[in-house]
Structures are given as structure tokens and as C-alpha cells.
Design a protein with these regions (language model features):
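N-terminal strand-loop-strand
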Residues: 1-16, 44
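A structural microfeature
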Residues: 2, 48-51
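Active-site-adjacent beta-strand/loop module that shapes the phosphate/pyrophosphate-binding cleft
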Residues: 43, 51-75, 85, 108
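NUDIX/MutT-family hydrolases
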Residues: 68, 77-108
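Generic C-terminal helix-cap and adjacent flexible tail
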Residues: 109-114
């Protein structure tokens, strides 16, 4: 699943994976579960880490951890994003993603389109 950032935010209307900042005392897995509840109204079952990435934008550095996960409960809703989509790895080139996701997208393509 990918989410389109709201137009008024930095990197507005670009696509990304759902997520957000880890709060004090949280693990990365707990943060992902919380963010998905807040942003999509779903509960996740979080699996293994797919990959970690550090990306430097001119205005900030982001540390991304992409997990394998499934929706355990709920139907995704657009609570904070402009749009949400389920896509396959073949559809990745049809979307404009945040630059921080480029390395992750390459790995997804290499892993699932062999």
C-alpha cells in the first residue's frame, strides 16, 4: 500500500509508504502500528524488517525502516493522506514517490520482479 502526501505538506502529492516518527519509549514496530491506526484506521500485524534506509533531504535527514506487515483488522481509510492505493511492484513506475523511498522501491522491484 502506498499513500499520497497532502498537497500542503513538504513533498506534497508525492507517494510514500505509511509511517511516521518513533515516539519516546516506542519500538519501530509499535510506532508503525500507532501510525497506521492514526493515518489509516487499521491494525497491523508487523513482520520482519524488509530494509532500512537513511536519506538526506536539504531540510532534514530521514531514517526509514520498511517492514513486512499485514492488516489484521479494519479497512484502510484516508484520514491524513490525499489518496491511498494498493499497487503491485510492476506498477511502481506509474507513481511519483518521495526521493527517500527510491532505494526501497529498487529493492522491491529486484526482489519481486525477477
Amino acid at each position: 500500500m502506498i499513500c499520497q502526501r497532502p498537497a500542503h505538506k513538504a513533498r506534497g502529492l508525492l507517494w510514500e509508504f505509511v509511517g511516521g516518527k518513533v515516539e519516546p519509549g516506542e519500538t519501530k514496530e509499535q510506532a508503525l502500528i500507532r501510525e497506521c491506526r492514526e493515518e489509516l484506521a487499521v491494525t497491523l500485524a508487523v513482520g520482519e524488517v524488509f530494509m532500512d534506509v537513511v536519506h538526506e533531504y536539504p531540510d532534514l535527514t530521514v531514517h526509514l525502516t520498511l517492514f513486512n506487515a499485514i492488516i489484521a483488522e479494519g479497512e484502510p481509510q484516508k484520514l491524513e493522506h490525499n489518496d491511498i492505493r494498493w499497487i503491485t511492484p510492476r506498477e511502481i513506475p506509474q507513481y511519483d514517490f518521495c526521493p527517500a523511498d527510491e532505494e526501497i522501491l529498487r529493492r522491491i522491484t529486484e526482489t519481486y520482479l525477477r
